Amino acid sequence: MKIDLNADLGEGCASDAELLTLVSSANIACGFHAGDAQTMQACVREAIKNGVAIGAHPSFPDRENFGRSAMQLPPETVYAQTLYQIGALATIARAQGGVMRHVKPHGMLYNQAAKEAQLADAIARAVYACDPALVLVGLAGSELIRAGKQYGLTTREEVFADRGYQADGSLVPRSQPGALIENEEQALAQTLEMVQHGRVKSITGEWATVAAQTVCLHGDGEHALAFARRLRATFAKKGIVVAA
C-alpha cells in the first residue's frame, strides 16, 4: 500500500525544513495568505533538494486572517487569482530546474470549494489552463474533486490526520468544538483507519466513507514534527510506503 504525505509550507513556520525530510509533497504558499516571492523560491529549492513533489497552495486574498475568512467572489475573479498564484509558483519551480506537480487550495478557499460547485469549477479550470498534467488535491468526496475529474485532471483525495470529521465526511469547522485532534494516539488511529479501511468516525459517532490518497500534516502545531515522525514510523511498521 502507498500513501502520499503532504504539508503546507512557506507560511512562516520554523519547522518547514525538517518537515520536508518527512513528507512526500509540499504545498507552497503563493503570497495571498502567507509567503512572498523569496519564501516561494526558498521552499522550492528545499523541496528539490529533498526530492519532495512541489505544489502550489493558492488562497483567497486574505493575509490579515491567514486565508481563513469566507469570501463570496465572482468565479472569474477566483479563476484569475488562482491562475496568477499557481502560474507564479510554476515559473519559480521551472527557473530552479524543478517541476510543479500539484495544486491544493488553502483555508477557506479549500473549504468553500469542497461544497460550492461554481467555485470548485473556477479552481479546476485555472489548474487545467496552467497545465492539464497537474494533480488537483481536494477534500475526499468534495465538489473540488468532482470538478477536477470533469476537466480530465488527475485528482488526489485528501484526509486530515488531526482534524475532526462530520457525519457527511466534511471537516468540523475550526470555530466549533472537536475541530482539532490534539491527542496523538487518537490522530494516529484515525489516520490508519482512513488509509487502511477508507472510513472515519465522525464527532457524533457515525462512520463516514473517505477515499484517502494523501494525508495532510499540519506543521504549525506544538508537536507537529514529533507527530510526523511517529506517523512515518507507524506507516513503516504497517508496510505502508510514503510516496507522491
UniProtKB/Swiss-Prot annotation:
Q: What class of enzyme is it?
A: hydrolase
Mention one GO molecular function. 5-oxoprolinase (ATP-hydrolyzing) activity
Pfam families the UniProt entry points to: LamB_YcsF (PF03746)
**What stretch or stretches form a coiled coil here?**
none
Which domain of life does this protein belong to? Bacteria
Q: Which keywords does the record carry?
A: ATP-binding, Hydrolase, Nucleotide-binding
EC number(s) on record? 3.5.2.9
Gene Ontology terms describing biological process? carbohydrate metabolic process
- Tell whether Signal is among the UniProt keywords: no
Which Gene3D superfamilies has this protein been placed in? Glycoside hydrolase/deacetylase (3.20.20.370)
Recorded hits in InterPro entries, A to Z, give: Glyco_hydro/deAcase_b/a-brl (IPR011330), LamB/YcsF/PxpA-like (IPR005501)
Please list the reactions this protein catalyses.
5-oxo-L-proline + ATP + 2 H2O = L-glutamate + ADP + phosphate + H(+)
Indicate the family of this protein.
Belongs to the LamB/PxpA family.
Q: What does this chain do?
A: Catalyzes the cleavage of 5-oxoproline to form L-glutamate coupled to the hydrolysis of ATP to ADP and inorganic phosphate.
**Complexes and interactors:** Forms a complex composed of PxpA, PxpB and PxpC.
Q: Which NCBIfam families match?
A: PRK05406.1-1, PRK05406.1-3, PRK05406.1-4, PRK05406.1-5
Q: What is this protein's name?
A: 5-oxoprolinase subunit A
